[in-house]
Amino acid sequence: MKNRQDELKIQIAVVNWIKSNFPEIRYCASAGGMRTSLSVAKKMKASGYVKGFPDLFLYHPTMTKNGLAIELKTKTGRPSVEQKQWLEDLNARGYHAAITRSFEETIELI
């Protein structure tokens, strides 16, 4: 549970940094790692939520990439099989998809 809380703190800091420094960038955060009730989880799945989707997705293409997908982990956090598959698939489709392990590493990537 501690890792999830630490990852959430990193994600909140990154989102605030994006809002302050790049307000024009469109982004979306997934609900991954959030604890919900069984009924809410069923609704999320039925409405399209997919296990392993990256924590942050920036809809901001560059000259060489379609956008940026970030899976946030702590120094000791490990990605799931589904998270690894998402990152691999997105990279193969022209996105930059990566795992970052700190606030500093994440903003450097952005």
Where would I find each of the regions flagged by the language model?
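Catalytic phosphate/metal-binding cores of nucleic-acid and nucleotide-processing enzymes, i.e., regions
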Residues: 1-110
